[in-house]
């Protein structure tokens, strides 16, 4: 692997350009190199992408720590036992999480690149697509095929005042220097559910707020069972509502919602938005070359992972497909094989597994009941 962070005017001779150095980008680049192709892997910022840096790895490390706190206190369920654990040094716990992230990023990403001589890693600023290649900083890279794997980022919901209160997201929550006494979580999907329970077990008073209900993508019975478990642990759930306003004053952050036609206010030290993510497609020149995106900016791809422009593919969180790290790597591998080998692999998520790292854990494989009915299948 050669690091080409220099200012040549143009570098050609590549068979494939991969934009993004996360799980999808690495999967695509390695697949291309294994096929004997010369690959330019274009990163921007910290190598490794969402999962290892700010997603799966740090959140699961903290969830595991919170489990230790909870299980110690749960010993009293058994006659003759008692136990108690608490967070004595939040900053040390956060630092241990950061150390784990650094170690895994090095082992799983940075140390892997030198094994692939046909992959040139380039980190010289954001890339912009042009006809037949991309521009990166002051340089132009040329290749007949390009795979976009630039990932996604957290976004704030549209609530009056939310831009002014210093709202946290799933990344900044785990970077707090001081453990808060109370938190409001907006969004009750799998990210919100995992982080809300984790912080509650750390001793934080948690209110979880959602327009619909907890885990809206799960079966209703599962959602209800998990909601009961959360409430038994002291988490306050506010669901079936609309957001009105949010403000910050000396008392903290106050969120006002409308529930059953009546205003309800809840106050906490911070508000954490886990209400969704958006694709990293801004300023990439997609419109100029005709790459179709949906209303949220995600790149629309076919079953072969190709975009609306021939020769340009996309995979991972930047697309309108499944937002899981293993599906990102899977889709990127298909895209690379189709792009550089001319094969016709098709994205298939019919038996896709998924899991929510709550307690109790929630997992599934394939279609849910509602999805199966929508697909015209007989459900008993």
Where are these regions (language model features)?
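Structured beta-strand/loop patches that form or line metal/cofactor-binding pockets in enzymes
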Residues: 363-380
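FAD-site-proximal beta/loop scaffold in flavoenzymes
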Residues: 163-179, 265-341
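Short hydrophobic core segments
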Residues: 17-19, 127, 141-151, 185-186, ...
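N-terminal Rossmann-like FAD-binding beta1-loop-alpha1 element of flavoenzymes
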Residues: 14-41, 192-201
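Beta1/beta-strand and adjacent pyrophosphate-binding region of the FAD-binding site
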Residues: 8-24, 179-189
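Glycine-rich dinucleotide-binding loop and its adjacent helix/turn
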Residues: 56, 150-205, 209, 237, ...
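Glycine-rich flavin
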Residues: 2-14, 30-37, 42-179, 212-216, ...
């Amino acid at each position: 692997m050669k690091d080409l962070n220099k200012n040549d005017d143009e570098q050609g001779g590549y068979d494939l350009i991969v934009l993004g150095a996360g799980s999808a980008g690495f999967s695509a680049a390695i697949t291309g190199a294994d096929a004997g192709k010369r690959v330019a892997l274009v990163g921007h910022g910290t190598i490794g992408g969402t999962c290892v840096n700010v997603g799966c790895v740090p959140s699961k490390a903290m969830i595991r720590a919170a489990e230790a706190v909870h299980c110690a206190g749960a010993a009293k369920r058994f006659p003759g036992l008692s136990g108690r654990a608490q967070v004595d040094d939040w900053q040390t716990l956060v630092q241990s999480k950061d150390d784990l992230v650094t170690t895994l990023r090095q082992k799983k990403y940075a140390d892997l690149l030198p094994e692939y001589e046909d992959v040139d890693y380039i980190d010289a600023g954001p890339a912009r697509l042009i006809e037949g290649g991309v521009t990166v900083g002051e340089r132009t890279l040329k290749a007949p095929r390009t795979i976009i794997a630039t990932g996604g980022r957290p976004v704030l919901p549209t609530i009056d005042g939310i831009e002014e209160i210093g709202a946290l997201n799933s990344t900044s929550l785990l970077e707090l220097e001081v453990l808060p006494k109370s938190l409001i979580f907006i969004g009750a999907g799998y990210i919100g559910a995992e982080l809300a329970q984790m912080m509650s077990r750390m001793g934080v008073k948690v209110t979880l707020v959602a327009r619909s209900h907890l885990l809206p993508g799960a079966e209703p019975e599962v959602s209800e069972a998990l909601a009961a478990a959360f409430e038994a642990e002291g988490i306050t759930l506010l669901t079936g509502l609309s957001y009105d306003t949010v403000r910050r004053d000396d008392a903290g952050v106050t969120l006002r919602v409308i529930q059953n036609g009546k205003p309800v206010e809840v106050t906490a030290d911070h508000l954490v938005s886990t209400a969704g993510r958006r694709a990293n497609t801004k300023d990439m020149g997609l419109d100029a070359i005709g790459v179709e995106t949906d209303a949220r900016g995600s790149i629309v791809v076919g079953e072969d992972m190709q975009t609306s422009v021939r020769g340009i593919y996309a995979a991972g969180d930047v697309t309108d497909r499944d937002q899981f790290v293993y599906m990102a790597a899977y889709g990127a591998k298909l895209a690379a094989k189709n792009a550089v080998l001319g094969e016709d692999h098709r994205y298939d998520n019919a038996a896709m597994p998924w899991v929510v790292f709550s307690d109790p854990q929630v997992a599934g494989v394939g279609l849910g009941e509602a999805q199966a009915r929508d697909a015209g299948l007989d459900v008993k």
